[in-house]
Amino acid sequence: RGSYKHVLSTVMEEVVSIFSSIGYEVAYGPEAETSWHNFDALNTPDWHPARYESDTLYLDKNLETLLRTQTSTVQIRHMEENDPPVYIVAPGRVFRSDQLDATHSPVFHQLEGLAIDKNLTFTDLKGTLEFFVKEFFGSDIETKFIPHFFPFTEPSAEVLVKWQNGEWLEILGCGMVDPNVLSNVSYPDTYKGFAWGVGIERLAMLRYNIDHIKNFYENDIRFLEQF
């Protein structure tokens, strides 16, 4: 048999390519992170459930080092080292204390995006993500944005797509970057921005009608060779 590229690698590369086509650069960061980069810098309050040991995999007793729960940490590191404007996507693995079920895994793949510039609005965010959705799922796909909450964006939204059976399915979260996040990296208040995050397994499961996330990790050649 010949060799096959893993379906998650293929989907990740496609998503990166779509955003690269409109000027986004790719940024990377460490999987073992500080609590500051993962939570504090992203405006996550001390009481937020995401900080609990039941949700996050900590690497020390002081709860100061952890396996990142999101690739937003890369956005913080990039802004610490680069002046605005910023247009980046951050792909990579993330880790959470999830029990394995049909749609959850303690390790999964995510791509987060960040745009920081002068005069960016929610309309720019909406246009960017609608472009992505149509490039990935097809030009006839319907989308809608519904209000949501994330600590690091305000206002925040979830993006839903109308699937073949008429059901609306959530595919990603997004919003305008909270001013506190920009202040934490010493960006001038003349800059604004938006951010989003999407799960690669989620996209692959929808596109290819895969019913259980474990299929990606079992190395069954009968599954992998379909892609």
Predicted regions, residues:
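TRNA-recognition modules of translation machinery and tRNA-sensing kinases, especially anticodon-binding
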Residues: 2-227
